[in-house]
């Protein structure tokens, strides 16, 4: 435990090897524009025995023209957006919707789990993520190291063609579509890959996202993770590779997050090392809180999920009184 304590103390002040590339915002501009113009193409109400909520499944198209699906729960009394002027929005529209992203290889959370948010009066949208490659299907269990994940999803020679780029695009489209469909801002939340998606959405969609939460977010401090491949910035080629992986770095995205953020890290996590998570956390410029779990690895942490509820109640109360 002494070793973990020393590692934690060293990590607390770490900010990562490299800051955000100068072309970060311009790189994502096309994706953001697409997301802000995307819309729900179909919405199907699902049968339910409860009157406490309405269950739907919506479809919409991502940047590569793949049709995505998401689960939607509307608490009783909440409906989809109406063409009202801002001053005419009902009081319930002040409450944001929770947009949930799953970890790599893990399916969408159950309808029952999603009800924990709708019980607070918050609509919920949960992306049904596209299938991943077979060798990545156990990533959510912590079966791959940070370097293995980065090598699989990040192309240092061409960030735009990286698998991770498309997965972040999916998150941007989901958050923007959810905000427009429900007529309110969103809380983006995810674990692992989903945590990175949540943070990128908060960074790049400031009008659509009002709070973000991430547990063990992947792909933070990519230049350190991939140092053997991208080098140390001592040649033009190395500089270019470092910038490329920085475009897909959740710690770089964190520099643009202005909304309240709750971040969690597990000290035994080899997929999302604590050092990278602190690099991300220390670069968040706005209101932020960190939770550290010494005895956990890359896994679901019930204590964090319980603390989420208290955090949401506090933050949303502040949002509604502003």
Report each predicted region and the residues it spans.
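Hydrolase active-site cap/lid region
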Residues: 195-243, 292, 300-303
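N-terminal targeting or regulatory segments adjacent to alpha/beta-hydrolase or S9 domains
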Residues: 1-53, 79, 84-91, 120, ...
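Cap/lid segment of the alpha/beta-hydrolase catalytic domain
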Residues: 114-116, 123-168, 224
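Alpha/beta-hydrolase fold nucleophile elbow
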Residues: 181-192
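C-terminal catalytic histidine-bearing segment of alpha/beta-hydrolase fold enzymes
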Residues: 278-322
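The serine-hydrolase catalytic nucleophile loop
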Residues: 104-117
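Short beta-strand element of the alpha/beta-hydrolase
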Residues: 92-104
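The feature captures the conserved acid-bearing segment of alpha/beta-hydrolase catalytic domains
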Residues: 223-283
């Amino acid at each position: 435990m002494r070793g973990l304590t020393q590692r934690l103390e060293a990590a607390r002040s770490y900010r990562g090897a490299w800051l955000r590339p100068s072309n970060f915002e311009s790189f994502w501009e096309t994706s953001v524009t697409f997301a802000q113009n995307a819309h729900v193409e179909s919405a199907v109400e699902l049968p339910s025995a409860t009157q406490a909520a309405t269950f739907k499944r919506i479809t919409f198209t991502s940047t590569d023209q793949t049709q995505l699906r998401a689960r939607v729960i509307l608490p009783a009394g909440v409906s989809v957006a109406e063409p009202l002027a801002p001053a005419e929005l009902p009081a319930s529209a002040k409450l944001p919707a929770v947009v949930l992203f799953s970890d790599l290889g893990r399916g969408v959370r159950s309808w029952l789990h999603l009800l924990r948010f709708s019980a607070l009066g918050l609509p919920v949208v949960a992306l049904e993520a596209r299938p991943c490659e077979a060798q990545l299907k156990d990533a959510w269990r912590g079966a791959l190291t940070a370097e293995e994940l980065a090598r699989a999803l990040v192309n240092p020679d061409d960030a735009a063609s990286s698998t991770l780029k498309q997965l972040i695009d999916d998150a941007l489209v989901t958050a923007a579509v959810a905000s427009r469909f429900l007529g309110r801002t969103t809380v983006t939340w995810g674990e692992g890959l989903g945590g990175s998606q949540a943070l990128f959405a908060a960074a790049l969609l400031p009008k659509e996202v009002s709070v973000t939460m991430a547990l063990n977010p992947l792909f933070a401090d990519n230049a350190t993770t991939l140092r053997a491949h991208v080098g140390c910035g001592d040649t033009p080629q190395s500089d270019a590779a470092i910038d490329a992986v920085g475009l897909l770095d959740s710690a770089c995205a964190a520099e643009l997050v202005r909304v309240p953020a709750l971040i969690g890290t597990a000290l035994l996590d080899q997929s999302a090392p604590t050092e990278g998570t602190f690099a991300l956390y220390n670069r968040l410029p706005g209101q932020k809180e960190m939770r550290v779990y010494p005895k956990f690895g890359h896994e679901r942490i019930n204590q964090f999920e319980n603390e989420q509820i208290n955090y949401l109640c506090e933050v949303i109360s502040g949002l509604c009184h502003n």
